[in-house]
Amino acid sequence: TMGNNITESTFMLLDNLLKWTKSQTGRMNSVFQEVDISEVVVFASKMSDLVAQVKSIAVEYDIPGPISVNCDVDMVKTIMRNLMSNAIKYSNEGGRIIISVRETPTHARISVRDFGTGIREEDIPKLLNPEIHYMTYGTKNEEGSGLGLQLVQDLTRRNGSELTIESAEGEGSTFTFTIAKEQPRSETVEDTSGGIARP
């Protein structure tokens, strides 16, 4: 329902703001543990089922089986929740989203693909630049501030990865990140904002 949609959007915005504030003030700790990334990805994605149903969007999973990785589970859930929200926001009613997980010798590669409005190539860097307040609107005029993707970029880096975006205007977008099977062993993990995050 519309009420559920608004509640979910409000919760995610507040959660994103809290995590972004912690990240920028050096108060976000990374807690790595060994998990099946396929299970985490499916669980986190299904949290967006109600929102997808409002726009009659079909969510498909292309996941071959369990893949063991070392990651911060809460961060990965936040990454997936934001990527799913983004894919739903810019998908047309009755569209579809494909979530895929692939295994490499050292990593798991996770992708969220939509077939929605897409992004102009020159606009992609603006989405990930915290210095630019880049406003966008979804297919039902859902507002997008860019904070979600900036947080996703930050959290992927904290898990030893980078967010990559492939998009074509009018054809849709694919957001991909990787998670290492083994994280580097150290007493402390350097916080990119200047603090020290302890594992």
Predicted features along the sequence, with ranges:
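Helix-loop junction within the histidine kinase core
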Residues: 21-32
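Conserved catalytic submotifs in the C-terminal HATPase_c
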Residues: 31-36, 53, 58-68
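Short helix-loop "hinge" at the ATP-lid/N-box region of the Bergerat-fold HATPase_c
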Residues: 87-88
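C-terminal end segment of the histidine kinase catalytic
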Residues: 157-199
